[in-house]
Amino acid sequence: MLNHRYAAWSEIALHGKDQLRQRVAFALSQLFVISDKSALDNSHLDIATYYDGLADYAFGNYRDLLEFVTLSPAMGVYLNMLGNEKPDEDNNIRPDENFAREVMQLFTIGLDELHLDGSLKIQDGQPIPTYDIDTVKAYAHVFTGWHFYGTTYNTWDNWWQNRNFRNQMVLVPEYHAQDVRKALLNGVVVEAGTDGERAMQMALDSLFEHPNVGPFVARHLIQRLVTSNPSPDYIARTAQVFNDNGAGERGDLGAVVKQILLDEEARQPLADQAPEFGKIKEPLIRGIQMIRAFGIYEPNTPKPQWYDYVFNQSPLSSPSVFNFFSDSFTPAGELNEMGLVAPELEIINDTYMVRNSNHAAWWSMWTPSTQEIDAGHERAMTIDFTPFISMLQNDPAELLDYLDLVLLSGGMNDTMREAILDYDQVAKEWLSDVERVKEMTFMVTGSPQFAVQR
């Protein structure tokens, strides 16, 4: 089932007509993390259902998305909210705090209070914590009594009879901590006696309305979509749109994504960008970009399923709830000294570099052309080199311009361009035209420039 899920994800990533929605969904999957490296290791249809939900809400409202995630049975299993029970001291039962902690730290507000531009608020020389252990306990009590759709008081302990990942979790009132007063964030208090459904809505509202959410979400989405080191002004402009889309709506993700992609900082010409602008491409995104650029896999054919081996990254397969990498990771050396972050470099190591280079060569140099496949035989991986050969024969620089456009977004510098054209001028003495195309492609896809998005 794992390979089927990867194949389905690949089909959408390579051939889906809603590429922006899918990119945003992938970014959200690294914020609202679940993973098959957990109790969900054999629940691949259920993980796929969760991902479909992220895509459905990618341009919707963040409050609705937060509720979808909270009541998702996949998330319930992953962070132990499903089956979470009210206190019972006689039986040593206390509400599980896992989801309560992560919904604050990782999904909405972070650890410390933020200004609109994402900078820390400081008091007496120290950051101001957003919550304490009492807050965690209060939310943990709110998140009790929820189980698989169809569960009742009588079937609570027989969870296998109710196993249902297609529908959102439901409240079983007898297991909810209704008799406990809960002091939440933003001055919200759930009084004792409040029913579990109402308590849940109050808790999610208290998180959604917190002033940290705008800059917290803005930074994450900017880092996944545009640049690792956005300026404070870029974050502030995006957070302001989160707070109000111009029509009085808070949390409009469609407006937020539009702001991120059309912001003046994102649209600057390469020559005008600050030196620190841009990001390392996630390994998985880099591989998908190359496959898409050359149509290596046709629609509705078998797709690659070995992402972890090649990229150190697979969809919804992070090693923990903290994602594949930290948004604040900085490698030792010059970037660290400059106070810059490069999150994606946390999963790029020597082994990955060798495997990535090998697979760049495999895809660009050793993938057969459609003309090389004998009639009557099927091969999932092929490239039709005809248009590329035509460009090469017309002018090698024309082919290189195309590779520059689709792989480097027009960012190839003169030194790289001259080196590739000089090599081709010599290599054409012993290489066929199709071999020249393959070698030029590998020189681009194997380059450091291809690893960077600017």
Residue ranges and their predicted role:
Residues 1-9, 43-303, 451-454:
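Active-site substrate-binding loop specific to GH73 endo-beta-N-acetylglucosaminidase modules
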Residues 4, 8-19, 26:
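Structured, charged N-terminal subsegments at the starts of enzyme catalytic cores
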Residues 13-17, 39, 43, 92:
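Short secondary-structure transition/capping motifs
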Residues 26, 63, 438:
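Residue-level detector of short, conserved catalytic/binding motifs and their immediate flanks
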Residues 32, 210-214, 218-247, 258-454:
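Flexible, low-complexity segments enriched for small/polar residues
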